[in-house]
Regions:
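Hydrophobic faces of well-ordered beta-strands that scaffold small-molecule active sites
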Residues: 11-19, 44-46, 64-70, 94-98, ...
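Catalytic cores of alpha/beta
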Residues: 55, 76-90, 135-146, 174, ...
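Conserved anion-binding
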Residues: 80, 85-86, 95-164
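Conserved N-terminal beta1-alpha1 strand-loop-helix module at the mouth
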Residues: 1-90, 142, 146-149
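Generic structural signal for well-ordered alpha-helices
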Residues: 29, 33, 51-52, 85-86, ...
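Short secondary-structure transition/capping segments
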Residues: 56-58, 78-79, 108-111, 139-141, ...
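Glycine-rich phosphate-binding active-site loops on the catalytic face of alpha/beta enzymes
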Residues: 67-72, 90-105, 150-168, 193-225
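Alpha-helix-loop-beta-strand connector modules within alpha/beta enzyme cores
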Residues: 48, 52-73, 110-136, 149-150, ...
Length: 225
């Protein structure tokens, strides 16, 4: 049975429609933006080279331009991360989805992790990606705590296109609950492998406020039929 229009709008508003394929074309990015406008998605997440185009396509709408920074492990030098974040701000990004330096996290170099993220979070509202599929439960907890301490607005499980960095949905749901407990007051974003409304609902029930997916259109069409 089709879902009521107002409920569809509420569902769309939690979706960050994502196109971070390295081989994405200009036409495909434009199509992603048009889909976001059509369905009323929360935002469009793209790689840095497409921020200017996405901004041009979405100007005058409520759809946020979100830029992915430094996948898959967040290990680029700090100054390069700052430079890229600053550049995409000038090009029209509204938010950053920034990968935490997962190597520094694993080696417990927390001072480095926190210093890097604090500076980035001063540039634009930032979601911190922790690559939960690489982490133990204890590391997920610590990563979420660091994200909160950095001034981020949100902690996120993984990137859409990093198969090693995101876990199976059941494991992801467990991590979402840990993230919620460890970073009270922050938004929680689930991404990676979310392809259907059932997947979305599972993530929402586990505590996700935002859903990152390249399958937003398919999910919305599923609900309309």
């Amino acid at each position: 049975m089709p879902i009521e229009k107002e409920i569809l709008k509420e569902i769309a508003k939690v979706i960050d429609q994502t196109n971070i394929r390295k081989d994405a074309s200009q036409d495909e990015i434009m199509e992603t933006c048009e889909q976001a406008k059509e369905f009323g998605f929360r935002g469009v997440c793209v790689n840095p080279e497409w921020v200017r185009l996405a901004n041009q396509q979405l100007i005058g709408t409520d759809v946020k331009v979100i830029c992915l920074i430094d996948p898959p492990m967040g290990t680029s030098p700090h100054q390069l991360r700052i430079q890229e974040a600053s550049r995409v701000k000038l090009e029209g990004a509204d938010e950053l989805d920034v990968v935490m330096n997962i190597v520094d996290l694993k080696y417990e170099r927390y001072f480095n992790v926190l210093g890097d993220l604090k500076e980035i979070c001063q540039i634009l509202p930032t979601k911190v990606i922790i690559g939960s599929g690489y982490l133990t439960d204890t590391e997920v907890r610590k990563a979420a705590e660091l994200a909160k301490a950095s001034g981020a607005i949100c902690v996120k499980t993984a990137t859409e296109k990093d198969p090693l960095g995101h876990s199976e949905l059941a494991e992801k749901a467990k991590h979402l609950k840990i993230m919620r407990e460890s970073a009270p007051g922050l938004l929680i974003k689930a991404a990676g492998g979310i392809k259907s409304y059932a997947d979305l609902l599972m993530m929402r029930e586990a505590g996700a406020d935002i859903i990152g997916t390249s399958h937003g259109v398919e999910i919305m069409r599923e609900l309309k039929t």
